[in-house]
């Protein structure tokens, strides 16, 4: 009987310990983008965070704990990578909605003018990993998501 109770307690303890584990927090957006750059070719991408975060997304420096916004610098392409670190869960939910709206805007624009990019847009990733919210519109989505997954 003692063995059965001990075994049951040990099982419950192991279960509670496993449930208490939290996923590793992603690096801040600039560090995460550096990791992405080292794993995936990112030529011709330019940081437009200072100019476009507020004008395109309505996000100010006071709204986040870190942000990067990269677009293709050459030609007319829909490639964008936006990574935002919210201050709290409410902010992360708001960022998700903002990036969801941004993705819809990119898709609508491409349907009218840049139809060759529709497959890339269709495979875009909109992610929420804890307080980090990201929009990845890139031909390298799978490789970029592997970088994210390496922190889990």
Whereabouts are the PLM-identified features?
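Sec-dependent signal peptide recognition
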Residues: 2-10
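C-terminal motif of bacterial Sec signal peptides marking the signal peptidase cleavage site
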Residues: 15-18
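Extracytoplasmic/secreted envelope proteins and their assembly/folding machinery
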Residues: 29-33, 37, 50, 81, ...
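Short, compositionally biased low-complexity segments enriched in polar/charged residues
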Residues: 47-76, 90-94
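A short, solvent-exposed beta-edge/loop patch
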Residues: 73, 116-152
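A short acidic-to-branched-hydrophobic micro-motif
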Residues: 78-88
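Short Gly/Thr-rich strand-loop-strand
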Residues: 89-128
């Amino acid at each position: 009987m003692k063995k059965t109770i001990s075994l049951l307690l040990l099982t419950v303890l192991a279960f509670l310990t496993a449930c208490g584990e939290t996923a590793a927090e992603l690096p801040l957006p600039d560090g995460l983008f550096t990791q992405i750059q080292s794993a995936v070719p990112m030529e011709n991408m330019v940081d437009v965070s200072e100019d476009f975060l507020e004008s395109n997304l309505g996000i100010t420096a006071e709204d986040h704990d870190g942000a990067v916004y990269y677009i293709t610098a050459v030609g007319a392409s829909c490639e964008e990578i936006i990574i935002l670190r919210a201050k709290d869960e409410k902010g992360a939910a708001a960022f998700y909605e903002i990036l969801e709206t941004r993705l819809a805007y990119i898709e609508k624009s491409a349907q009218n003018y840049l139809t060759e990019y529709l497959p890339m847009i269709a495979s875009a990733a909109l992610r929420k990993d804890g307080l980090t919210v990201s929009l990845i519109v890139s031909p390298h989505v799978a490789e970029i998501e592997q970088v994210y997954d390496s922190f889990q």
